[in-house]
UniProtKB/Swiss-Prot annotation:
NDH-1 shuttles electrons from an unknown electron donor, via FMN and iron-sulfur (Fe-S) centers, to quinones in the respiratory and/or the photosynthetic chain. The immediate electron acceptor for the enzyme in this species is believed to be plastoquinone. Couples the redox reaction to proton translocation, and thus conserves the redox energy in a proton gradient. Cyanobacterial NDH-1 also plays a role in inorganic carbon-concentration. It catalyses: a plastoquinone + NADH + (n+1) H(+)(in) = a plastoquinol + NAD(+) + n H(+)(out); a plastoquinone + NADPH + (n+1) H(+)(in) = a plastoquinol + NADP(+) + n H(+)(out). It comes from Prochlorococcus marinus (strain AS9601). The gene is ndhM. The keyword Translocase applies. NDH-1 can be composed of about 15 different subunits; different subcomplexes with different compositions have been identified which probably have different functions. This is NAD(P)H-quinone oxidoreductase subunit M. It is found in: Cellular thylakoid membrane.
Amino acid sequence: MEKMLLKSTTRHVRIFTAEVVDEELKFHPNKLTLDLDPDNEFIWNEDSLNKINEKFNELIKERAGKDLDDYELRKIGSEIEGLIKFLLQNGQLSYNPDCRVMNYSMGLPKTNEVL
């Protein structure tokens, strides 16, 4: 029986047991592909992207030798979501005012002014 492509989807993180070939996802049992912020809700800089990629690689290494089932993928996705929120709360990431829908899914931006 051929294995199926697994995925974990959160609001800002999508993880697939696949690799990108000719702009298409192709199942691969030993590779994960990260699709970060598919709705462009945030403005990303190199530093914040590097932190996300480092954390993603760290989480994968921690699971070396384990089956990458949907539960493990969800745990990885949840940890990446937590890092996104941390970066946002610490001013290392900001909301994109040009995104399709401005809903502040990770909380209202912090300002010095009283709302």
